[in-house]
Regions:
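Sec-dependent N-terminal signal peptides
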Residues: 3-11
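C-terminal segment of classical bacterial N-terminal signal peptides
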Residues: 11-18
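Structured extracytoplasmic
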Residues: 20-187, 208-212, 218, 242-298
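Extended lipid/amphipathic-ligand handling interfaces
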Residues: 41, 188-190, 194, 220-230
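Surface-exposed extracellular loop regions of Gram-negative outer-membrane beta-barrel proteins
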Residues: 198-201, 205
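Beta-strand-dense domains in secreted/periplasmic systems and polymorphic toxin scaffolds
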Residues: 202, 236-240
Length: 298
């Protein structure tokens, strides 16, 4: 298995000036978007990748800001560290099992995370985006889902090169925004492999209409993929930040959840049984198993 470690050494090679407003929905931008949509729609037909197993290493930080104006820096309230077994099977089955979990509280808290905060994003969210088990964000159209060009505008950005031992992969930034900002949608940048039209990176926020919880201020997400077997762009690193306004003892407060994940140790085509994927996507091993996980560092 070869990792695209050079993903960390992204070398910008300017091909054009940054896209201006008049570049939205140019022929070349829409052509690339449609190629990416087509690839995602038919990815399951690629029988070379039937399934995989991987390991995910994650941290969740809960921070708080307190007081009028919320001008003080956030304070760490609680930190959680998690280890997961990650499974995927074509066309889009996902299972994650928490095998290690430890936490430390710096301040009193009774926070309880949504189940999907405890794992990674598979399939780059699929056709629609959902967070907080549907309580925070639900049914937001993915810009690279079928019909994405009817919902979103696209504009080309700069082209970059990811230098691998055997070749260089050209990646182009594809900016995305909704045609109607009053709709539930995302705003951000997609990075697409020009040759294969696979999604390499997503960095985005949501429009206000997407937030179902009225206390939500902002959600920002970055999904980085790595090139494996010189063919498949699969989850490599992910970050999420959720900011929510509230009150604490009648004092204005802001709660911030920050999640950071790294995914590695991929094994391919293990003939995983369908029974493995039954039930909830994210499950936890028994507590004695989680408590006995051999952490690498104190």
């Amino acid at each position: 298995m070869r990792w695209a470690a050079a993903l960390l050494l992204l070398l910008a090679i300017p091909r054009r000036a940054p896209a201006m407003a008049q570049d939205w929905n140019s022929d070349s931008a829409l052509a690339l978007a449609r190629r990416a949509i087509e690839h995602r729609s038919h990815a399951a037909v690629d029988t070379a990748l039937r399934d995989y197993r991987a390991q995910a290493h994650g941290f969740l930080f809960f921070l708080g800001q307190f007081g009028e104006g919320l001008s003080e820096p956030p304070r760490l309230v609680k930190a959680d560290q998690l280890e997961l077994e990650v499974y995927w099977k074509a066309p889009g089955l996902s299972k994650q099992r928490i095998i290690g979990w430890r936490d430390r509280a710096e301040l009193p808290t009774d926070i309880s995370y949504h189940r999907d905060h405890l794992g990674i994003v598979q399939n780059n969210f699929g056709r629609a985006l959902r967070l907080g088990e549907g309580d925070e964000v639900r049914d937001v159209p993915h810009p690279l889902a079928p019909g994405g060009t009817d919902v979103y505008d696209f504009a080309l950005g700069d082209t970059s090169a990811i230098v691998l031992p055997t070749r260089a992969v050209r990646v182009v930034a594809l900016r995305v925004r909704p045609k109607h900002f009053a709709a539930a949608a995302i705003v951000g940048t997609l990075f697409v492999d020009i040759e294969s039209a696979q999604l390499v990176r997503m960095a985005f926020n949501f429009t206000p209409k997407a937030y179902l919880d009225p206390q939500l201020e902002d959600v920002s997400i970055v999904l980085d993929n790595a090139l494996l077997e010189e063919r498949y762009w699969l989850p490599y690193r992910q970050e999420i930040e959720i900011r929510r306004r509230a009150t604490w003892l009648d004092v204005p407060a802001r709660g911030i959840i920050r999640g950071r994940w790294e995914i590695d140790s991929y094994q391919f085509n293990l003939d995983l049984p369908d029974s493995l994927f039954r039930g909830e996507e994210i499950v936890a091993a028994p507590k004695p198993v989680r408590d006995s996980f051999p952490w690498r560092a104190p």
